[in-house]
């Protein structure tokens, strides 16, 4: 039985993998086996960190909002603000509130003060 030379098929497959790993350091960008291992590892990490990124940004937004609210001097916290926002049925999510907190603190103070006034007024009159 004669040996069949496979031509460029294997080389094309390896160069495709090498293009993915061209920015890796050392043997991770030169040796085929380590390239394939590092490619798998990189894809796993990117998939995992896409979910983590959502969590981390939510934590960051909550921290920013809470810092600005507590800085205002009123005994008001993040959890009360969010609770009152839901009571008022305002469609301001945490990302928007964090952007407002960074760019214009006074605007966030005004929003929180208006919410406090309306919720306190409704509770005192017995509407809620």
UniProtKB/Swiss-Prot annotation:
Domain of life: Eukaryota
Keyword annotations: Chloroplast, Plastid, Ribonucleoprotein, Ribosomal protein, RNA-binding, rRNA-binding
Annotated Gene3D superfamilies: 6.10.160.10, Ribosomal protein L20
Record localization: Plastid, Chloroplast
InterPro entries xrefs: Ribosomal_bL20, RIBOSOMAL_L20_CS, Ribosomal_protein_bL20_C
Molecular functions per Gene Ontology: rRNA binding; structural constituent of ribosome
Assigned protein family: Belongs to the bacterial ribosomal protein bL20 family.
Function: Binds directly to 23S ribosomal RNA and is necessary for the in vitro assembly process of the 50S ribosomal subunit. It is not involved in the protein synthesizing functions of that subunit.
Name recorded for this polypeptide: Large ribosomal subunit protein bL20c
Naturally occurring in which organism (per UniProt): Panax ginseng
């Amino acid at each position: 039985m004669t040996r069949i030379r496979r031509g460029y098929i294997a080389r094309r497959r390896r160069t495709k993998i090498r293009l993915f790993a061209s920015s890796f350091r050392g043997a991770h960008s030169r040796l085929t086996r380590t390239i394939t291992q590092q490619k798998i590892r990189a894809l796993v990490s990117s998939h995992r960190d896409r979910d983590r990124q959502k969590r981390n940004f939510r934590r960051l937004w909550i921290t920013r909002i809470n810092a600005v609210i507590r800085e205002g001097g009123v005994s008001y916290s993040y959890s009360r603000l969010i609770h009152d926002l839901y009571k008022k049925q305002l469609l301001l999510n945490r990302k928007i509130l964090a952007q407002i907190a960074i760019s214009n603190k006074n605007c966030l103070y005004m929003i929180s003060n208006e919410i406090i006034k309306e919720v306190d007024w409704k509770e005192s009159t017995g509407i809620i």
